[in-house]
Amino acid sequence: MKRLVLISLVLAAGCSTVPPTNVHQPMTARPSPRFEMANGNGSIYQAASSRPLFEDRRARFVGDTITVKITESTTASTKSNNKVDQSNAQKYGLGASTGMFGRVLPGAMDMSASSSTAFSGKGEAANNNIFTGNMTVTVIDVMPNGNLLVSGEKQVAIGSEQEFVRISGVVNPSFVDAFNVVDSSKIADARIEYKSSGQVSDGQVMGWLARFFLNVMPF
């Protein structure tokens, strides 16, 4: 009985999988190494833990957070029209034939051939995507030139459905406004994902047996 329950739990866990991701890892800041506390010097100012008094609170260190304003809109279209029409006609002859073969089949030495090819094809495709929203990400690395590598994930569970929003990329601190917000169009190497996991998303995917027959069918 225990073995049956264990197998059932393993199968249930396999049915609820997290969609794979291509964003920069890790999804949050790495744990910082622990340093020994510096000895106090008896003064209010401590050089080991000081930050400028009039410094703004924009993200610039590992572990800081930045709010990303997602305003993605892409439109693409393509159209093609191909037409091919080709014809060919040939005729060969040796004139009057002599001998018995020529008397029996007087036109046997005259040959003609013709061919005609016609092809017409049209294709048109259009794609329009809009993705808007806000999400806060974490600085996971600071590059030598000061740019920030950010990454973050948001999970929302509604009933049996789970939605995953993931963002990562490189942010120039000069593009971050006074409210610590940056537009997604200002993120370099941006990787923005919106995926879901659950019964609804599974119903939109063709089953493995149907995919197998679709691949082996010659027509």
UniProtKB/Swiss-Prot annotation:
One GO-annotated biological process of the protein: bacterial-type flagellum-dependent cell motility
Which residues carry the S-diacylglycerol cysteine lipidation?
A: C15
Q: Which UniProt keywords apply?
A: Bacterial flagellum, Cell outer membrane, Lipoprotein, Membrane, Palmitate, Signal
Report membrane topology. Answer: Lipid-anchor
Which HAMAP family does the UniProt record give? FlgH (MF_00415)
What is this protein for, i.e. what is its function?
A: Assembles around the rod to form the L-ring and probably protects the motor/basal body from shearing forces during rotation.
State what protein this is by name.
Answer: Flagellar L-ring protein
What is the source species? Dechloromonas aromatica (strain RCB)
